[in-house]
């Protein structure tokens, strides 16, 4: 049986990357929240 997680850098960046986050209002809210919390890594 094939496992559900088939890692790929491209698809990961396209969905969870910084620029992908900045495209939407909700994504910008995520970045803002992570900045406020003091996260070292804002996105993948």
UniProtKB/Swiss-Prot annotation:
Basic residues bias spans: 11-27
Q: What GO molecular function annotation could you give as one example from this UniProt entry? A: structural constituent of ribosome
Q: Which UniProt keywords apply?
A: Ribonucleoprotein, Ribosomal protein
Q: Which InterPro entries is this protein grouped with?
A: Ribosomal_bL34, Ribosomal_bL34_CS
Q: Where is this region: Disordered?
A: 1-27
Keyword field contains Cell membrane: no
Keyword Ribosomal protein assigned = yes
A GO BP term here is: translation
List the Pfam families.
Ribosomal_L34
Identify the GO cellular component terms for this protein.
Answer: ribonucleoprotein complex; ribosome
Domain of life of the organism in this record?
Bacteria
Family note = Belongs to the bacterial ribosomal protein bL34 family.
Q: NCBIfam families given for it? A: rpmH_bact
The record's listing under PANTHER family reads:
LARGE RIBOSOMAL SUBUNIT PROTEIN BL34M, MITOCHONDRIAL RIBOSOMAL PROTEIN 34 FAMILY MEMBER
Cite the HAMAP family for this sequence.
Answer: Ribosomal_bL34
- Protein name per the record: Large ribosomal subunit protein bL34
Q: Which organism is it from?
A: Nitrosomonas eutropha (strain DSM 101675 / C91 / Nm57)
């Amino acid at each position: 049986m094939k496992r559900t997680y088939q890692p790929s850098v491209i698809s990961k960046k396209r969905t969870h990357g910084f620029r992908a986050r900045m495209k939407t209002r909700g994504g910008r809210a995520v970045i803002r929240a992570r900045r406020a919390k003091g996260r070292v890594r804002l996105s993948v």
